[in-house]
Amino acid sequence: MIPTSDITGLILAGGRGSRMGGVDKGLQTFRGAPMAMHTLMRLSPQVGHMLINANRNLAAYESFGVPVVADSVPDFAGPLAGILAGLEQCQTRYLLTAPCDSPFVPTDLAAKLSQAMEEANARIAMPVTMEPDAQGQPRRQVQPVFCLIDALLADDLIVYLQGGGRKIETWTARHATVDVLFDDSTAFANINTLEELHQLAERR
């Protein structure tokens, strides 16, 4: 398994929050603390170093005690721009990402992804969960914003973004990628509206 010291964790908090009315999702209070702080507390014990990707309210994120990196690609280019910012700044061979609005990040995320990456000789590892479709039948759901990435792929990601690419799964398909099954799909629940925020706080 990849040593913890070889992995940098990256919290993706650089989006517009448009589905939540433009608010900064990572700074919304969830059970008494900002959502991004919940993600930080669950992710940081799994890695050797931490970064936060943010494009506004930088001082608020810096108060978490973790280096903050902004997108180098302009105009809120999506999560891949945040991932690139992390790849450009991390000093380790691997980068582990998680969005700021996922307060139940699995505590074994790094361990399971790194083990699968090594066993498959892959460059990227992503979680997969089984979730019901419209007919109630189980289907595979890839969780692409939670991923372990070989930092040597940074140059290829630059090329992809410069060519106008924005979809995570389209970029990861260019490389050897392994999917890793996780049983608890709610661990990857992200929060896109204030209503979902309140519902999740009450439910779990």
Curated annotation (Swiss-Prot):
Record localization: Cytoplasm
GO BP annotations listed: bis(molybdopterin guanine dinucleotide)molybdenum biosynthetic process
Cofactor(s) listed: Mg(2+)
This protein's record includes keyword RNA-binding: no
UniProt cross-references to InterPro entries, sorted A to Z: MobA-like_NTP_Trfase, Molybde_CF_guanTrfase, Nucleotide-diphossugar_trans
Pfam families assigned: NTP_transf_3
Root EC class: transferase
Protein name: Molybdenum cofactor guanylyltransferase
Annotated organism of origin: Ralstonia pickettii (strain 12J)
